[in-house]
């Protein structure tokens, strides 16, 4: 029975590795329901998960899951202790915590780029996860850890990729990486720097204004010179007329 379980797990892992780029160490996101089931079944997750998956694993959770377990009180105190020993992954709900199921679902959005496994006993969450391709799902049944087979949505997605109708998530990531290496995709940080440089640069309009100012000063200076000449002309003519009158 144990050998059959491991054979199935190996087959499913191969499927996710080849089609979605899942790799070791396998990152397994746990919710409160899975931790509670492990506690009741006396399952040592740190020992049994690597043995079952025949690979190195990382047990992970989120702040929202820990907050939810803390809120639920004494009944789930043991589950909370198990979750607290897991690595805490950053979720987008740092300020306002959401339910554990909502949080874990958000962690596998956009094609599950971090290749998380999702471990839960929540049927509602499991159904939502199965509607998204490429997410390995785990649960506990009869005190035994099980890696679920790929969902129909996942299989349909892989078939569509194979027939050329879609590009796989793994290929999308590879294409983006190649574009970044070739400099075809600009890093957002570089864009911000360029924008900042443009703002801090000299404004050509301000240069034009300065030129206009110098022209104005030149014209005003020439007007002053002209005025001075006129004044000098008047004074000499006056002197000449007075001289002529005196002689006459």
From Swiss-Prot:
Compositionally biased intervals (Basic and acidic residues): 177-190
The UniProt record lists the Glycyl lysine isopeptide (Lys-Gly) (interchain with G-Cter in SUMO2) crosslink at: 179
Residue segments, region Disordered? 177-248
Gene Ontology cellular component terms for the protein in this record: nucleolus; small-subunit processome
Where is this protein primarily located? nucleus
Gene Ontology molecular function, alphabetical: small ribosomal subunit rRNA binding
Where does the secretion signal sit in this chain?
none
Compartments (UniProt record): Nucleus, Nucleolus
- Source domain of life is Eukaryota
Q: Does the keyword Lyase apply?
A: no
Q: Which CDD domains match?
A: PIN_Fcf1-Utp23-H
Residues bearing PTM Phosphoserine: 174
Question: Compositional bias (Basic residues) spans?
Answer: 224-235
Does the keyword field hold Ubl conjugation?
yes
Q: Which UniProt keywords apply?
A: Isopeptide bond, Nucleus, Phosphoprotein, Ribosome biogenesis, rRNA processing, Ubl conjugation
InterPro entries registered for this protein in UniProt:
Fcf1/Utp23, PIN-like_dom_sf
Task: Mention one GO biological process in which this protein takes part, according to its record.
Answer: rRNA processing
What PANTHER family is this protein classified in? RRNA-PROCESSING PROTEIN UTP23 HOMOLOG
The family annotation for this protein states: Belongs to the UTP23/FCF1 family. UTP23 subfamily.
Question: What task does this protein carry out?
Answer: Involved in rRNA-processing and ribosome biogenesis.
Per its record, how is this protein called by name?
Answer: rRNA-processing protein UTP23 homolog
Native organism: Bos taurus (Bovine)
């Amino acid at each position: 029975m144990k050998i059959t379980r491991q054979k199935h797990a190996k087959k499913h892992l191969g499927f996710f590795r080849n089609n979605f780029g899942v790799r070791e160490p396998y990152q397994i996101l746990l919710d409160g329901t899975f931790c509670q089931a492990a506690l009741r079944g006396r399952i040592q997750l740190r020992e049994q998960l690597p043995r079952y998956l025949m690979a190195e694993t990382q047990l992970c959770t989120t702040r929202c899951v820990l907050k939810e377990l803390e809120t639920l009180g004494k009944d789930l105190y043991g589950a909370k202790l198990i979750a607290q020993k897991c690595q805490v992954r950053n979720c987008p709900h740092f300020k306002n915590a959401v339910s554990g199921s909502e949080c874990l679902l958000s962690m596998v959005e956009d094609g599950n780029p971090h290749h998380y496994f999702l471990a839960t006993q929540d049927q509602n969450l499991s159904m939502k996860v199965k509607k998204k391709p490429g997410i390995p799902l785990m649960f506990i049944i009869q005190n035994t850890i099980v890696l679920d087979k790929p969902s129909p949505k996942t299989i349909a997605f892989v078939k569509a990729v194979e027939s050329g109708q879609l590009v796989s998530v793994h290929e999308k990531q590879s294409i983006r990486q190649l574009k970044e290496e070739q400099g075809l995709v600009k890093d957002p940080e570089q864009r911000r720097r360029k924008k900042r440089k443009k703002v801090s640069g000299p404004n050509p309009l301000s240069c034009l204004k300065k030129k206009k100012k110098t022209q104005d000063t030149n014209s005003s200076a020439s007007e002053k010179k002209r005025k001075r000449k006129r004044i000098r002309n008047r004074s000499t003519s006056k002197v000449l007329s007075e001289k002529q009158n005196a002689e006459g």
